[in-house]
A protein has these predicted regions:
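Alpha/beta-hydrolase active-site loop
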Residues: 81-102
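Short alpha-helix in the alpha/beta-hydrolase fold that links the catalytic acid
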Residues: 238-249
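Active-site glycine-rich loops that stabilize anionic/oxyanionic intermediates
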Residues: 39-42
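N-terminal cap/lid segment of alpha/beta-hydrolase-fold proteins
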Residues: 1-24
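Short beta-strand/loop motif that positions the catalytic acidic residue
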Residues: 223, 229-231
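Catalytic active-site module of serine/aspartate enzymes centered on a nucleophile-bearing elbow/loop
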Residues: 260-329
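Conserved alpha/beta-hydrolase
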Residues: 44-76
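Alpha/beta-hydrolase-fold enzymes
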Residues: 111-200
Length: 330
């Protein structure tokens, strides 16, 4: 696996974020750069092998931790104010500015997991994104959880998680083995009772106004990227309703959906998180690679437009104007 370089960069409000970059030694103006937006309370290092895979395919890649998570966690998480709004409008915005500065003029692409798809819609500079791939990206409401698991998930994520957060001032996910620790604001966003984010989103301790909500909706409609939303049939978090609820916000994008069943690739389960495990490098990762580099899916997977026309069949010839891969410096 290629060795990334550790880096730090400012979010839009100056908060220092930490991450890694996979860069090629020789610059090339047409080489795409991929920003990887993590899921809620998932460390950026979870995506390292996926990032190395995209790097080997000819991309520059940036991974990073949102504020309050992993390398971007403050010394004291109790009382630290951060939520999905900050992760999108400030942190992802900072990542876009960083790749624009570091790889000036190169095409910017996004690979987003779960809540990372919502972050795509909230950054003021999201119009810079030329193409996006999302995995299990949704604005989930508890009623959207898988029917057979809904009650257990409701107790876990909507009763126990907010109760522990209220007691401690943050969610101790790592201690429980559920996920990483998370700021209280993220828990508030996750456990909100309404199915639309603008109705329940919070911005730190600031009062959310109708003007802010209108601005968020405008920013979600701003990107003109080609967007592929991948869903997995055994994903208990991201059912069809949740996936399509988020997809509906991106009215300026050309949108496609791809739904995959584990049996299609000969495995018993995939779920919400396993896509980024390297055991799927030969079966699932080509979906992301081919979409980001070619704007189409491998022939064994059929995406459908949402709504509209079917995307073109993938040409197996190299993407036009792609640069030769090279080792990272150092």
């Amino acid at each position: 696996m290629s060795v990334p370089l550790a880096l730090s960069f400012p979010a839009a409000d100056g908060y220092v974020l930490h991450g890694h970059v996979w860069a090629h030694a020789q610059p090339c103006a047409s080489r795409p750069v991929v920003v990887v937006n993590p899921a809620t309370a998932v460390l950026s290092r979870y995506y390292a092998r996926f990032a190395a895979y995209l790097h080997a395919a000819g991309c520059e890649v940036l991974t990073y931790d949102y504020r309050g998570i992993g390398g971007s966690r403050p010394a004291r998480l109790r009382g630290f104010r951060a939520g999905w709004i900050e992760w999108g409008s400030l942190d992802f915005e900072g990542a876009l500015r960083e790749v624009q500065r570091r790889f000036a003029g190169q095409p910017i692409l996004v690979a987003a997991h779960s809540a990372g798809g919502l972050a795509l819609g909230l950054a003021p500079s999201n119009h810079l994104v030329a193409r996006a791939f999302t995995m299990g990206a949704q604005f989930a409401h508890w009623r959207d959880y898988a029917p057979g698991q809904r009650l257990g998930m409701w107790w876990k994520w909507h009763v126990l998680m907010p109760a522990l957060t209220a007691c401690l001032g943050y969610f101790p996910g790592r201690r429980l083995g559920w996920m990483e620790d998370a700021p209280a604001g993220v828990v508030e966003d996750w456990t909100a009772r309404a199915p639309r984010f603008e109705a329940v989103a919070r911005r730190g301790g600031e009062r959310v106004t109708a003007r802010m909500r209108a601005q968020w909706l405008t920013q979600c409609a701003q990107p003109r990227a080609d967007l592929l939303a991948l869903s997995i049939s055994d994903d208990p978090f991201a059912g069809d309703a949740a996936i399509e609820r988020l997809l509906a916000y991106f009215t300026g994008c050309r949108r496609w959906r791809l739904h995959v069943r584990p049996a299609q690739i000969g495995v018993p389960a995939i779920g919400h998180f396993a896509f980024f495990h390297d055991r799927f490098a030969d079966t699932l990762w080509p979906i992301a690679r081919d979409w980001l580099l070619h704007g189409a899916c491998p022939p064994e997977f059929a995406a459908t437009a949402w709504p509209g026309e079917t995307p073109p069949a993938l040409s197996r010839s190299p993407a036009p104007a792609m640069c030769a891969a090279s080792a990272p410096p150092g």
